[in-house]
């Protein structure tokens, strides 16, 4: 169940969100504006709670691991699965099969940092039904070895020349080894890349360049794993032609969290504040919740530039320091209620103290001890690969440029643990201030935080299966009261998988296998590029003259063409329609689930019911209607209700100052749509049309005609 809740703490009244068009009529009036002193909008997702994720088959494999193992014979395999879903163990099963049954000489596991190497320690797999155990000889887990990454290159060469089978090293050590010995030295080996989002198709990304060489040589097997197939810089992870060679195993957040035994609710909130964050932390922090606090990087806007004092302020706000635990290094702080809080400080500049605390947090004997630690304060640590199952709140201070980093931080809080039914992620962000020299950067940070929120909604939602109207009922799908009706656009739900089948009139369907795979597996990557495009979001949220189709058809169409140039025009259009449908239907379902149209909160509605209500409330759900929805209208509503009126005006002014006129590229795209319009309607788009989209297409035609008259190369 996906719900957007807005509360006013002073009267605890629920407030609904109106559409952006209503907001723009009277741009900054008639709204409730909230600051960090009040509760703010949050995404609240409730899951099925069926414990399937913790159940194992006869080989000791959980659902995701079994799914991955079924594709163990693929030469190139990409596993996309959330944090804590068991990717490391899935790789163990696959690697052992490649060594025993697929002719691979050795398995090399590459992780981004040394601490993650512990995920691949020895595992007694045979104890749970598998044919053998996972055993790594100590000298070949280079993550445990002293020295620099570059200094471990000779050890990798010794491993390659020897007879042992499994090696663990960092991405950096692996890069240095490939630089020195060449890709041919790794022929006949399985290379596994954990946290694959560190790779990029950019030529400057060494790991990405090496991977492309391995694929070109085609003499090794590659298994890539990631909890978030996103990059904060919006770079492509792989070139399309290389990506097409990978078979994918996709296990969604929805499947993961629905399958938990205990945890059933995840809340996400974005809080804006003024002045210093250290004065606002307790507004969003509950000392009774097991919490990881990530303070801002010293170069971030939110930083006071003194990380040590920031930690001291947080500790002072929590209570009074009593002592330091000699064994663990945890700070013992007495809260206002007399409770002793055990606080782990991973920010301390003293490496001896920090290492003692870090070692205590990794103590395997304390993994299931809920009382071992209460609050962890970190800066760059406690993210990727950090395992603390009891974490109930991930509090991140400052904007994070990478969606991947946000997913990784959220993953720290989404472990299943006895008695843990709810968890939350909070991002505390400084409001843009016009007095700042870098106000433009501050505005960009704010918009990117909202983009991350939109993307996380997509990540957390169930999977959609879009089909044209009258496609027929599917087995195991519930179509609501009365069942499947061939006279309408139906919405069916598979309660076991959480998949939603939705019929849309006029929907173009992918024809090639590549396009079908993209529509099934890769829509979130397209949406990432779309919502992280600064100009697209600015126009969608703040330019009242922007017609939704300029975003949904022109901008998304361009992204699809750039991302998948090898698809034909029909398949590109099908992919575009599926991507926009996924984004807009989630936004509209969220609005329906919270009573956003009627003004009456209906918080008992789940996302699924919101989807059904949206489909029922329109006379007929067709792709043209979906294209006419501004994908950012709900995002604007969130911003208008969570930021002060003065700050919101400043944001609008900054964005208005950099508004750009129609580009030649956009004009070409509009002319293409105008040709389609003329084929359908039997006439050209008119400049005097009351339909803003028709008028915009006509403007594109006029612009291009003018360029031709002026002798420009169009």
What does each of the following model-derived ranges do?
Residues 74-94:
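Walker A/P-loop
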Residues 82-83, 111-112, 117-155, 166, ...:
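Conserved C-terminal RecA-like helicase domain
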Residues 94-119:
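Conserved SF1/SF2 helicase motif Ia
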Residues 238-279:
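Interdomain hinge/linker at the junction between the two RecA-like core domains of SF2 helicases
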Residues 351-454:
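Conserved RecA-like P-loop NTPase helicase motor core
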Residues 415-546:
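Long, hydrophobic alpha-helical segments
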